[in-house]
From Swiss-Prot:
Activity at various pH: Optimum pH is 8.5 for agmatine and MPP(+) transport.
Name of protein: Solute carrier family 22 member 3
Keywords annotated in UniProt: Cell membrane, Glycoprotein, Ion transport, Membrane, Mitochondrion, Nucleus, Transmembrane, Transmembrane helix, Transport
GO terms for biological process, alphabetical: cellular detoxification; dopamine transport; dopamine uptake; epinephrine transport; epinephrine uptake; histamine metabolic process; histamine transport; histamine uptake
Glycosylation sites: N72, N99, N119, N322
Principal place of residence: membrane
Protein's organism: Homo sapiens (Human)
Effect of P289A: Decreased TEA uptake
Pfam name, any one: MFS_1
NCBIfam families per the UniProt record, alphabetical: 2A0119 (TIGR00898)
Record remark: domains: Contains one proline-rich sequence (Pro-Glu-Ser-Pro-Arg) that is required for transport activity.
Stored Gene3D superfamilies: MFS general substrate transporter like domains
Annotated membrane topology: Multi-pass membrane protein
Entry's transmembrane regions: 21-41, 182-202, 241-261, 269-289, 381-401, 468-488, 498-518
Length: 556
């Protein structure tokens, strides 16, 4: 009885049909990148704003001031190291204290309102609302007043998105295994579109946050299921390069995003531009089939056979009647637990290091991306260049992992990222070209580390625990994404370069730890926990090759 992989070889492992489906699904990586890093442009800090009290508003109306005149006459002067253009952002003069009458503003002069106070010194009070922006509604910061005491809410928007990713990984990942890949993919695309439109027209901040969370849930569903569909309809030899190329389309999304943001002047327009393409993916219902491998495991052999024949026809192949019964091996394991991943020494070491690697990759990668929004300079050009820098990372991975193995490039990429972050933090601001060059190396390093951890994670777990182990460890990626914005923005408020030091320390430690992982180059995938325990031993090359494990057979 032929296996599914043998049938796939017969119909073509990466023929015209697979290439078409692959290209269509790769576009999901572009839109997922929009969602993943879009906060950099949605939440851009306004250049010019100040706190406007009720008396200042009334006085501006009476005197007929322009916004600039109002700012010059009523905003408190800068104090300490604060630059002049930031005057009056988080404090305001209590102009209504000029006298105790109801018409306090009548005592204030249009030429010099502060002259009504002794020594021209009006009382200062913290701003609790009423900010005025030079460009109202241009970003979510000005839309929902996410400044001063409310600045932490901007961090919350990205943390909530990552919480949605984490939720989607478990809920929609399970649903895709139970109800089908393409069904969940299409539902997720619809969910991303609907929730994204609601986000764009959210009447208040709570509604914005709730639907941004839901968009994260569905967004993770599109990314996971498209990745699984592609890897399940191509041959085993193509899976590695297919996985890397999909991530290159994610990078393509990062490159395209600044162009979209540059030509659209407000955050609602940007949100719609990065959301509406998800509705186009619903057309895939007619061109992207269900995974035939999944159909066989769900005892839906007739449908799987129809799809295989469709693939064969498109690829110019022929599936003979000998393939009327096809088997696929299912992992015979039920209810795996975290204890299975830490019970034995080698499994425990691999699990803890991989969890830290996922966490570090997410924190450093997202931190470096979002940092572009707070360091000044031309955000659009800087963001575009940072995206272009990621493209060589995939090429370097393809050139090194089969020659040098997994462990050395994995460690080197983390160490390069860590050292680059530390060096950038202490370079003088006057040599901008050198700071940019070193920071670029750091971005390239962490991009490579992020892509390699996907591969290494799957190669270090046995068949019976692979899906569960990868899901659990990669969950630390989303957890890192929840922490990253708070870590970046709050530490940057203390010292702009402090987040870089934290990122550098984390990545450097990770680079050292991954050298403790066993090398998996040229070694068959482990099938049991015993195989994992033997990795790194002189006989590890035999792991997973001659062992037999109980399997259940699903057939056509």
């Amino acid at each position: 009885m032929p296996s599914f992989d043998e049938a796939l070889q017969r119909v073509g492992e990466f023929g015209r049909f697979q290439r078409r489906v692959f290209l269509l699904l790769c576009l999901t990586g572009v839109t997922f990148a929009f969602l993943f890093v879009g906060v950099v442009f949605l939440g851009t800090q306004p250049d010019h704003y100040w706190c406007r009290g009720p008396s200042a508003a009334a006085l501006a109306e009476r005197c007929g001031w322009s916004p600039e005149e109002e700012w010059n006459r009523t905003a408190p002067a800068s104090r300490g190291p604060e630059p002049p253009e930031r005057r009056g952002r988080c404090q305001r003069y209590l102009l209504e204290a000029a006298n105790d009458s109801a018409s306090a503003t009548s005592a204030l002069s249009c030429a010099d309102p502060l002259a009504a106070f002794p020594n021209r010194s009006a009382p200062l009070v913290p701003c609790r609302g009423g900010w005025r922006y030079a460009q109202a509604h241009s970003t979510i910061v000005s839309e929902f007043d996410l400044v001063c005491v409310n600045a932490w809410m901007l961090d919350l928007t990205q943390a909530i998105l990552n919480l949605g990713f984490l939720t989607g990984a478990f809920t929609l990942g399970y649903a895709a295994d139970r109800y089908g890949r393409i069904v969940i993919y299409l539902l997720s695309c619809l969910g991303v579109g609907v929730t994204g439109v609601v986000v764009a027209f959210a009447p208040n901040f709570p509604v914005f946050v709730i639907f941004r969370f839901l968009q994260g849930v569905f967004g993770k569903g599109t990314w996971m299921t498209c990745y699984v569909i592609v890897t399940e309809i191509v041959g085993s030899k193509q899976r590695r390069i297919v996985g890397i190329v999909i991530q290159m389309f994610f990078t393509l999304g990062i490159i395209i995003l600044p162009g979209i943001a540059y030509f659209i002047p407000n955050w609602q327009g940007i949100q719609l531009a990065i959301t509406l393409p998800s509705f186009l993916f619903l057309l895939y219902y007619w061109v992207v089939p269900e995974s035939p491998r999944w159909l066989i495991t769900r005892k839906k052999g007739d449908k799987a056979l129809q799809i295989l024949r469709r693939i064969a026809k498109c690829n110019g192949k022929y599936l003979s009647s000998n393939y009327s019964e096809i088997t696929v091996t299912d992992e015979e394991v039920s209810n795996p637990s975290f204890l299975d991943l830490v019970r034995t020494p080698q499994m425990r070491k691999c699990t803890l290091i991989l969890m830290f690697a996922w966490f570090t990759s997410a924190v450093v990668y997202q931190g470096l991306v979002m940092r572009l929004g707070i360091i000044g300079g031309n955000l659009y050009i800087d963001f575009f260049i940072s995206g272009v820098v990621e493209l060589p990372g995939a090429l370097l991975i393809l050139l090194t992992i089969e020659r040098l193995g997994r462990r050395l490039p994995f460690a080197a990429s983390n160490i390069v990222a860590g050292v680059a972050c530390l060096v950038t933090a202490f370079l003088p601001e006057g040599i901008a070209w050198l700071r940019t060059t070193v920071a670029t190396l750091g971005r390239l390093g962490i991009t490579m580390a992020f892509e390699i951890v996907y591969l290494v994670n799957s190669e270090l777990y046995p068949t019976t625990l692979r899906n569960f182990g990868v899901s659990l460890c990669s969950g630390l990626c989303d957890f890192g994404g929840i922490i990253a914005p708070f870590l970046l923005f709050r530490l940057a408020a203390v010292w702009l370069e402090l987040p870089l030091i934290i990122f550098g320390i984390l990545a450097s430690i990770c680079g050292g730890l991954v050298m403790l992982l066993p090398e998996t180059k040229g070694i068959a995938l482990p099938e049991t926990v015993d195989d994992v325990e033997k990795l790194g031993s002189p006989h590890s090359c035999k792991c997973g090759r001659n062992k037999k494990t109980p399997v259940s057979r699903s057939h056509l």
